[in-house]
Amino acid sequence: MATGFKLPELAPVKSAWGPPETEQIGGDIPYAPFSKGDRLGKIADWSVDQPKDGREQRGRQGAFAGRFRDQYQTYGYGASSIFGYQHSEDESSFSVIDRGSVNRTRTSARNGGTLLKVRGRGQNVQRGGRGGRYGSSGGRGAGDTVVSRSSGAGGARGRRFGWKDYDKHQRLRNASVTVGDDWQLLDEVEFSHLSKLNLAAAAPVTVDSYGYIYPYDKSFDKIHVKSEKPLQALDRVHYNPTTTEDPVIQKLALNSDANIFITDSILSLLMCSTRSVYPWDIVITHQSGKLFFDKREGGPFDYLTVNENAYDSPMDADNREGVNSPGALSVEATYINQNFCVQALRETEEEKYKLPHPNPFYNSKEQSEPLAAHGYIYRDVDLSLETDEKPVKLMVRTEVDGYVKNPANDVQYISIKALNEYDPKFTNVTGSVDWRSKLESQRGAVFATEMKNNSCKLARWTVEALLAGVDSMKVGFVSRSNARDAQHHGILGVVAYKPADLASQMNLSLSNGWGIVRTIADVCLKMPDGKYVLVKDPNRPILRLYSVPPNTFEEAAGPSLEASSTA
């Protein structure tokens, strides 16, 4: 039986012209965006499994991206994912597992590190209080030390910017001093501006000399790698007081016409500040038209840096007690320098060379420890310009370590320093070479690499030698006897340089250094009397000058000049 046919009802026609109005049917259905790039070849594809979640999808893309080109995509994925629904697993039972404490026993050169538990001899580093005494000894301290050794390849994995950049730590250092809430920022300057300064200063003039020194043992010049000489741990007291705690500077501040007082370690850092990478700070006191540049007790000026300018400088490991952390390497380098300086001298009473005055920091009646031989020479430098209304003179305390005699039997001052190698396995990271295998045949290349990795430290040593007026610098190469033992070292060789020649090789400009010092002094002399702190930014090449309350660092401050003048 044929079904009936019925015409649909037509909308009433209001006018006799035009089509009828369309009824609003389906107006509440949301619009699904689409793209012409969507694959529309199949209505439904039941042969490809939908990925469970994002983690599985990323894993498949990483492992099979080259084999399976077509990935699962929801219709409309090319334009928007608002209406594309992807099923995900229930993550209510998901939990994070901490795997940071898992010890990996097998490692490779590209992955991870190894935790080694070694028993070493602890060094005894003593720092005095207000007198500025800094002593070191080779004492033994028992104790187990967990050492974290890594070639730097166990870092975080991420986007690859360059060769092995994926495993390098981000170098974020902490400031040497915490900026207080009551500190006021006065000025800041970038290193690019400091490097353009220039001032031709007069040659330093000796004002007075204190202490005594011994002759240099020339047998150290004959040391070779095959005839390695062990570094001895000698108990000697070393003094490195800050400026305002120096009784000689206190006397000169009252009687001389100098208006800037500073020590050679602080002055050399200011003159070489554009080469510095690690953070540091200097306390500046402006009092009655005179400036005093001080260091904080136990601060960066009491220790030496290691590979500060290297491309991959030492970083703080997870275990900060490791022997290759920056702090441990700094203490080790200071310990090596002090012992090498004492061992390289012939300590005989007949050959002792006494300066006009005794050591101003040592009192034999109150202290019984043996004193390290040092000569303290106070020198005056004229930094005045023709346009200055008042002369600007700088008084600096310099140091000499020993002496040699020329063919005319005249005494010539020398400076004795030491470079240290802490782990030959890090040579591929820092760009250096193994000293024990290359020092004999490529001594020039070894020293050139050290000038690159320790540019700031060597530049400071050169400036200190030029300020003291020494004739020669003796630089020793000291390496660990065992890469895991930071207490036993061997002397592999000694090289001698003229300070002026070394400055020329390092492209070190004294006129630029004097320009930096004069610029900072001019800024501080224009400020009212008070205390200021010059801070090197820990992560950027910037110097900042802060005004601080008078009682800042008061626990480390020495006697004031007014008190010394009335005493």
Swiss-Prot record:
GO terms for biological process: cap-dependent translational initiation; formation of cytoplasmic translation initiation complex; translational initiation. Coiled coil: none annotated. Pfam families: eIF-3_zeta (PF05091). Residues 300-314 are annotated as: RNA gate. GO terms for molecular function: mRNA cap binding; translation initiation factor activity. It is found in: Cytoplasm. One of its GO terms (cellular component) is eukaryotic 48S preinitiation complex. Its main location: cytoplasm. Keywords: Cytoplasm, Initiation factor, Protein biosynthesis, RNA-binding. Residues 128-142 have a biased composition (Gly residues). Disruption phenotype: Reduced rate of protein synthesis, although the polyribosome content is not affected. Enhanced sensitivity to caffeine and defective spore formation. Residues 12-34, 122-160 are annotated as: Disordered. It comes from the Eukaryota. InterPro entries: eIF3d. The RNA gate region regulates mRNA cap recognition to prevent promiscuous mRNA-binding before assembly of eif3d into the full eukaryotic translation initiation factor 3 (eIF-3) complex. Component of the eukaryotic translation initiation factor 3 (eIF-3) complex. The eIF-3 complex appears to include tif32/eif3a, SPAC25G10.08/eif3b, tif33/eif3c, SPBC4C3.07/eif3f, tif35/eif3g and sum1/eif3i. This set of common subunits may also associate exclusively with either moe1/eif3d and int6/eif3e, or with SPAC821.05/eif3h and SPAC1751.03/eif3m. The eIF-3 complex may also include SPAC3A12.13c/eif3j. mRNA cap-binding component of the eukaryotic translation initiation factor 3 (eIF-3) complex, which is involved in protein synthesis of a specialized repertoire of mRNAs and, together with other initiation factors, stimulates binding of mRNA and methionyl-tRNAi to the 40S ribosome. The eIF-3 complex specifically targets and initiates translation of a subset of mRNAs involved in cell proliferation. In the eIF-3 complex, eif3d specifically recognizes and binds the 7-methylguanosine cap of a subset of mRNAs. Belongs to the eIF-3 subunit D family. This is Eukaryotic translation initiation factor 3 subunit D. It comes from Schizosaccharomyces pombe (strain 972 / ATCC 24843) (Fission yeast). The gene is moe1.
